[in-house]
């Protein structure tokens, strides 16, 4: 099994990179996010590798970090998720953001991935929610806040602040995290306009 490759970027394809390692070209399939972060052709690169062996082929999947590779494996434990869908999810969400999305039940963020509809996004959240914190630390306050928003029990100023940030174009995950941070500074009785202002300050960092 191949666990890591270090070589020179030979060329790129739509969903893969060919890595030249001592004269041998390895075709490595990657998420769009990973491909975007690799260097230009001719420069050195290294990737953590997941090797899939079948009767008729050997396929390599490459990742910029061990965390991304672990999520690739974990995603495939859910029915309906294969390698293509797993790479699609990792193309739109960083490992830390994916952990937050699952822990907070943000199905909309996950459903943005190609090949993932609302039903599969809900299944991913349901089956992986208890496992997500083990892969990346998620603020317990953020989880509680997300649960309150989902159940419509959050204070109105909180819900209004999150909605306002989302309407400004921020993803639900980032908006919720920013308001959670704002709440810690402003206190539970803060007005929506205060939470929005402090939330925007958090997002600008």
Curated annotation (Swiss-Prot):
The UniProt entry, under Pfam families, shows: HHH_5 (PF14520), RuvA_C (PF07499), RuvA_N (PF01330)
Q: Where is this region: Flexible linker?
A: 144-152
Extract the ranges annotated as region (Domain III).
Answer: 153-205
Molecular function terms from GO: ATP binding; four-way junction DNA binding; four-way junction helicase activity
Q: Name one GO biological process term.
A: DNA repair
Instruction: Using the UniProt annotation, give all residue ranges assigned to the region (Domain I).
Output: 1-64
Where is region (Domain II) located? Answer: 65-143
Question: Keywords assigned by UniProt?
Answer: Cytoplasm, DNA damage, DNA recombination, DNA repair, DNA-binding
Question: What's a GO cellular component annotated to this UniProt protein?
Answer: Holliday junction helicase complex
Keyword Transcription regulation set for record: no
Q: How does it assemble?
A: Homotetramer. Forms an RuvA(8)-RuvB(12)-Holliday junction (HJ) complex. HJ DNA is sandwiched between 2 RuvA tetramers; dsDNA enters through RuvA and exits via RuvB. An RuvB hexamer assembles on each DNA strand where it exits the tetramer. Each RuvB hexamer is contacted by two RuvA subunits (via domain III) on 2 adjacent RuvB subunits; this complex drives branch migration. In the full resolvosome a probable DNA-RuvA(4)-RuvB(12)-RuvC(2) complex forms which resolves the HJ.
Explain the purpose of this protein.
The RuvA-RuvB-RuvC complex processes Holliday junction (HJ) DNA during genetic recombination and DNA repair, while the RuvA-RuvB complex plays an important role in the rescue of blocked DNA replication forks via replication fork reversal (RFR). RuvA specifically binds to HJ cruciform DNA, conferring on it an open structure. The RuvB hexamer acts as an ATP-dependent pump, pulling dsDNA into and through the RuvAB complex. HJ branch migration allows RuvC to scan DNA until it finds its consensus sequence, where it cleaves and resolves the cruciform DNA.
The similarity comment for this entry is: Belongs to the RuvA family.
Under the heading NCBIfam families, the entry gives: ruvA
What's the protein called, per UniProt? Holliday junction branch migration complex subunit RuvA
Give the organism's phylogenetic lineage.
Bacteria, Pseudomonadati, Pseudomonadota, Alphaproteobacteria, Hyphomicrobiales
């Amino acid at each position: 099994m191949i666990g890591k490759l270090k070589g020179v970027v030979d060329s790129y394809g739509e969903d893969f990179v060919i890595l030249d390692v001592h004269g041998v070209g390895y075709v490595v399939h990657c998420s769009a996010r990973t491909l975007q972060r690799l260097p230009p052709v001719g420069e050195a690169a290294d990737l953590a590798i997941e090797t899939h062996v079948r009767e008729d082929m050997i396929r390599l999947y490459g990742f910029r970090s061990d965390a991304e590779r672990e999520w690739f494996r974990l995603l495939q434990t859910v029915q309906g998720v294969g390698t293509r869908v797993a790479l699609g999810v990792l193309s739109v969400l960083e490992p830390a953001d994916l952990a937050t999305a699952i822990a907070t039940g943000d199905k909309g963020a996950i459903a943005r991935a190609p090949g993932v509809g609302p039903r599969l996004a809900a299944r991913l959240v349901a089956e992986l929610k208890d496992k997500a914190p083990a892969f990346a630390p998620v603020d317990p306050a953020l989880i509680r806040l997300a649960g309150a928003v989902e159940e419509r029990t959050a204070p109105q100023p909180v819900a209004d602040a999150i909605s306002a940030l989302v309407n400004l174009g921020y993803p639900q995950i980032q908006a919720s995290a920013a308001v959670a941070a704002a709440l810690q500074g402003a206190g539970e009785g803060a007005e929506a306009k205060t939470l929005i202002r402090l939330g925007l300050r958090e997002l600008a960092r």
